[in-house]
Amino acid sequence: MQLPLALCLVCLLVHTAFRVVEGQGWQAFKNDATEIIPELGEYPEPPPELENNKTMNRAENGGRPPHHPFETKDVSEYSCRELHFTRYVTDGPCRSAKPVTELVCSGQCGPARLLPNAIGRGKWWRPSGPDFRCIPDRYRAQRVQLLCPGGEAPRARKVRLVASCKCKRLTRFHNQSELKDFGTEAARPQKGRKPRPRARSAKANQAELENAY
């Protein structure tokens, strides 16, 4: 008699506990591996996706690496270092009375804002980036006076000096001098014109006539 009475009391306590849970608004317990939070409900709504979410694991830019901010195809955005060089102009034994100053275009080309005298320097060069070289851009003419030894009268001479430099993009056809033939036989034929047959000389025609008889 005591065992059935104890079982009835246990069943009554369990039933009372379920009633209390349902009275507080909780959902029924489920025998699965999913935890149900009463405040969110059985099927919680996903949080809104942020527009500028860069942490998501998704392909961007079509699977290509992002555009490097310092790699540009516009040659005007590149600049090279201009070195000032002072020298005397000579013409045989004569030499200029005063030295002249011109620019020497040298160094590696890079973005103008990343030059050594600019603010915000950084590493911009990449192996896959385009190749540029520094070449003279504009020239200026200057007249100098040459002094000659031996009591000769001074003479004037006009020299051409570099005024500014620029960057030029290299192509895959540069530095391929071994593919070029600088001989006279490698002259390219002009397009649209047919080669003219060479006129026979009078001596060759006379020899043919003599052999005919």
From Swiss-Prot:
Glycans are attached at N53, N175. Residues 41-71, 178-213 are annotated as: Disordered. Residues 82-172 form the CTCK domain. It comes from the Eukaryota. Its main location: secreted. Residues 1-23 form the signal peptide. The keyword Repeat does not apply. The keyword DNA damage does not apply. One of its GO terms (cellular component) is Golgi apparatus. InterPro entries: Cys_knot_C, Cystine-knot_cytokine, Sclerostin/SOSTDC1. Residues 190-201 have a biased composition (Basic residues). Interacts with LRP4 (via the extracellular domain); the interaction facilitates the inhibition of Wnt signaling. Interacts with LRP5 (via the first two YWTD-EGF repeat domains); the interaction inhibits Wnt-mediated signaling. Interacts with LRP6. It is linked to Sclerosteosis 1: An autosomal recessive sclerosing bone dysplasia characterized by a generalized hyperostosis and sclerosis leading to a markedly thickened skull, with mandible, ribs, clavicles and all long bones also being affected. Due to narrowing of the foramina of the cranial nerves, facial nerve palsy, hearing loss and atrophy of the optic nerves can occur. Sclerosteosis is clinically and radiologically very similar to van Buchem disease, mainly differentiated by hand malformations and a large stature in sclerosteosis patients. Van Buchem disease: VBCH is an autosomal recessive sclerosing bone dysplasia characterized by endosteal hyperostosis of the mandible, skull, ribs, clavicles, and diaphyses of the long bones. Affected patients present a symmetrically increased thickness of bones, most frequently found as an enlarged jawbone, but also an enlargement of the skull, ribs, diaphysis of long bones, as well as tubular bones of hands and feet. This is Sclerostin. The lineage of its organism: Eukaryota, Metazoa, Chordata, Craniata, Vertebrata.
